[in-house]
Amino acid sequence: MKVLQLHCSEFSYKVTKETPVAEHPASPKEGEYENALVCFTCFEKRDVDREPEIIEAYVENIKTDTGRIGCSNVVLYPYAHLSHELGSPRRAKRFLGDLKEALEAEGLTVHKSPFGWYKAFGLTCKGHPLAEMYREY
């Protein structure tokens, strides 16, 4: 699991085109968020059968990070471009859904962009010492 986290004052995306592994329906087709921790998340082959432990560690890190930066808004953004060893799309979709539920159970407001769609996106990264983080699980 590879994750690029950016603390953004503004983040937006809009679905443009589906890929062969696109989830249907693409919902929501677009989103705009303020003061959000945007998590570009890549599910890899090595993550298979480790989902529960990854979710536990991911949730703990996000709770810590959002507390440190004063943000409770999280955007999960599926992002295959962080790895050449992708896990199956079916498992990745399920993982992201489970992760969203686990984060919401901790009281965070969580949004997830559609899996398997090309998206245009724009962001303004806050630029403080914790605004950009990379994690591997």
For each feature predicted by the language model, list its residue ranges:
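Domain-level signal for soluble alpha/beta catalytic cores
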Residues: 3-6, 39-49, 110, 127-129
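Charge-rich interaction surfaces and accessory domains that mediate macromolecular binding and assembly
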Residues: 4-9, 14-19, 127, 131-136
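Conserved mixed alpha/beta catalytic, RNA-binding, or beta-rich assembly cores of soluble enzyme
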Residues: 9-68
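Active-site-proximal loop/turn and secondary-structure-junction residues that shape catalytic pockets
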Residues: 10, 80-82, 114-119
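Alpha-helical scaffolding segments of alpha/beta enzyme cores, especially the outer helices
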Residues: 60, 64, 91-101
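Short glycine-rich, basic-tinged beta-strand/loop micro-motifs
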Residues: 70-86
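Short glycine/threonine-rich loop-to-helix capping motif typified by GTGT followed
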Residues: 84-93, 124-128
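Divalent-metal-activated hydrolytic enzyme cores
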Residues: 96-137
